[in-house]
Design a protein with these regions (language model features):
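Short glycine-/small-residue-rich flexible loop motifs, especially phosphate/cofactor-binding loops
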Residues: 11, 99, 170
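Terminal peptide-recognition signature
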Residues: 14, 44, 94, 102, ...
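A short, charged/proline- and glycine-enriched loop
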Residues: 84-90
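Basic, glycine-enriched DNA-binding surface that flanks or lies within the catalytic cores of DNA
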Residues: 1-84
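Acidic, divalent-metal-coordinating active-site segment for phosphoryl/phosphodiester hydrolysis
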Residues: 97-98, 165
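Conserved phosphate-coordination/catalytic loops
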Residues: 70-71, 93, 133-134
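Helix N-cap/beta->alpha junction signal
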Residues: 48, 94-97, 158
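TOPRIM fold recognition
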Residues: 88, 104-211
Length: 211
């Protein structure tokens, strides 16, 4: 979507959800986050060969529950921080805001958030009846593009679909060291961050994240 002249609503929304200002500004500076001109949604941008290839949308109004994708998005190239990945460990989340929340938690603990590699799957697939699951295309592509990854930390949601997806991915990627690391409190890492910071009034999302 076209960019708004500024990112004030996006910045204010993410700050209200507990995300650290430095991390928000980092994503804006590197072209990974902006405010869309028409609806003022957060747009979390994923890249392919330094060109935008994916956009996850999230409403910023106080009563908004919207989550979706920009038309023409290629989910293989989902939102990841940093854009230029490195290192052997990858932390995987269902949503972009959970990845940013995790980085904020690292900073609160005095750890170097810039050293972490995070990937949003932009939703998960529901497991099949036999318990198997389609491998998330964003994760498959990331591992293909970054063969140095040896350890995968699954930071998926603390609910039925998230737990089932985590178990299925662990089984599917047995050649890697896979660690299950759901949030200690709340449904997801943004929930956990808000609890740590004492923020209340979380709004659940609905809409176009793939399942």
């Amino acid at each position: 979507p076209p960019k708004h002249a500024d990112n004030r609503r996006v910045f204010a929304y993410l700050r209200s959800r507990g995300v650290d200002a430095e991390i928000i500004n980092h994503c804006i500076k590197h072209g990974q986050l902006y405010e869309d001109a028409e609806r003022h949604n957060c747009v979390f941008v994923g890249y392919r060969n330094d060109k935008p290839a994916y956009g996850a949308l999230r409403g910023t109004l106080s009563d908004s529950t919207f989550a979706g994708e920009a038309p023409g998005s290629d989910k293989r190239f989902s939102f990841a921080v940093p854009r230029c990945a490195g290192g052997k460990t990858l932390c995987v989340f269902e949503a972009a805001i959970d990845a940013l929340s995790y980085l904020t938690l690292l900073k609160l603990r005095g750890q170097d958030w810039r050293a972490a590699n995070t990937l949003s799957l932009s939703g998960i697939y529901q497991p099949r009846k036999d318990g198997s699951i389609r491998s998330p295309v964003a994760l498959e592509q990331y591992l293909k593009d970054n063969p140095g990854v040896a350890r995968i930390v699954l930071c998926l949601d603390n609910d039925g679909p998230g737990r089932a997806a985590s178990a299925a991915i662990q089984k599917r990627l047995s050649e890697y060291e896979v660690i299950d690391n759901p949030p200690r409190r709340g449904k997801d890492y943004n929930d956990h961050l808000q609890m740590v910071k004492g923020i209340s009034g979380r709004v659940k999302t609905r809409g176009g994240e793939a399942r």
